[in-house]
Amino acid sequence: PTPVSALVHSATMVAAGVYLVGRFFPVLTPDVLLVIAYTGGLTLFIAATIAVTATDIKKVLAYSTVSQLGYMMLALGVGGWVAGLFHLITHAFFKSLLFLCSGSVIHACHTNDMRKMGGLLKVMPYTGWTMLIGCLAIIGAGVPFVLGFSGYYSKDAILAQALLFSRTNPQHSILYLAVAGGAFITAFYMFRLWFMTFAGSPRDQHVFEHAHESPRVMTRPLVALAVFAVAAGWALPGGLGVE
């Protein structure tokens, strides 16, 4: 069920490994952290490239989760304890939102295949706009020095830590390139998901004719999570001990 996927893929089971590494961070040696960083970089890149080719809406989000976990592991590996756990927290909000939005779409269309969707924003405005907010949050959209979505702050912290690590260890500059490149790929597959689902004209008229907005009991949680997907990053850095 999609609500279970939202819980499992955002902040519980899949995040346990990141949480464990974060707890053991003070006792890990530099060599071990370097292995963790490269493992995270490889994970985020491979999972992101798979998400680019997926046509099942839930599989795109599942591989997106794997990619974001790679980000967190890479952050921990390059010494960014705060950055890694900060991204873990912001990820919980926008990934829960994205999975629940996908569940709303599947509930309306009775299919997971994005190739049969298209134009759904006309009949599912609440789901469409809240999912766009989730997409903007996961790609780290924002205006530098002004305001950004929650992912903007956590991903920026990871980028800054990876850049600092690459400057002090030039032989490992590929880790920074992995973070930066992964951010571009993330933006591509998330916008691909949204445009294939909600924009353009319907590709399957039968699916479109039966599509409808979900009831309020399903859309209200989307709006609540959308608020946190936007604003979670505004307050959390101070709570983590970072001004």
Predicted regions and their residues:
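Hydrophobic transmembrane alpha-helices and their helix-loop junctions in integral membrane proteins
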Residues: 1-213, 217, 221, 228-234
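Aromatic-capped, Gly/Pro-kinked transmembrane alpha-helices
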Residues: 227, 238-243
